């Protein structure tokens, strides 16, 4: 039986530097990933159920399977992205001795060094994502560029902060060459409590283990 997913609803509006029009367009694009993921899961399930995986249709099955990684990751990464934004805008950089700031200091030497690295990755040429991951076995943070949605994901690492840097995330508000301005706007809208929950959830799981 094929797995089915429902598009989530996100209560986001009045962000700083990211228009509601951009958000509405982005939500619709996300819903498209959900629909395509469901379609692919259904088609793949039919191939398996009918025993057609090793037959002459194998090339088609292979392409469906490869495509699933693109659509599914596109769906999930957008959910992480929307979840780490705060309606009405955030407060900028985290203040005080937060769990994330402490993790950034332990992993990079300081929060500012971590941020400079993350922003630098977000400015890289290409289409994809900048993601801060936590290594669950070490508790260390690291920043990575993900091409499209799936190439470069670090197996076993947990996404803690996810930034979409596809042009669709900002093209209505900024020119392609102005991606740094979008990144600045992104940081002014981060919901650090959501980021903390991701980090603390992993920490709690490690302690419980």
PLM regions with names:
Residues 1-209:
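Feature for soluble, non-membrane regions of globular proteins
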């Amino acid at each position: 039986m094929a797995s089915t997913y429902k598009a989530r609803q996100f209560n986001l509006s009045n962000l700083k530097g990211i228009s509601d029009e951009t958000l509405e367009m982005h939500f619709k694009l996300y819903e498209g990933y959900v629909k395509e993921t469901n379609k692919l899961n259904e088609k793949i399930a039919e191939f398996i159920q009918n025993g057609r995986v090793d037959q002459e249709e194998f090339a088609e099955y292979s392409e469906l399977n490869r495509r699933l990684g693109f659509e599914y990751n596109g769906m999930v990464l957008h959910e992480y992205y929307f979840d780490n934004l705060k309606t009405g805008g955030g407060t900028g950089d985290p203040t005080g001795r937060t769990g994330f700031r402490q993790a950034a200091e332990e992993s990079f030497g300081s929060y500012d060094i971590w941020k400079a690295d993350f922003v630098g990755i977000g400015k890289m040429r290409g289409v994809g994502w900048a993601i801060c991951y936590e290594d669950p076995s070490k508790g260390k943070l690291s920043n990575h560029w993900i091409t499209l949605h799936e190439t470069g994901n670090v197996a076993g690492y947990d996404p803690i902060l996810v930034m979409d840097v596809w042009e669709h995330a900002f093209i209505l508000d900024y020119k392609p060459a102005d991606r740094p301005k979008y990144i600045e706007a992104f940081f002014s809208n981060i919901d650090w409590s959501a980021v903390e929950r991701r980090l603390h959830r992993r920490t709690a799981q490690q302690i419980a283990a």
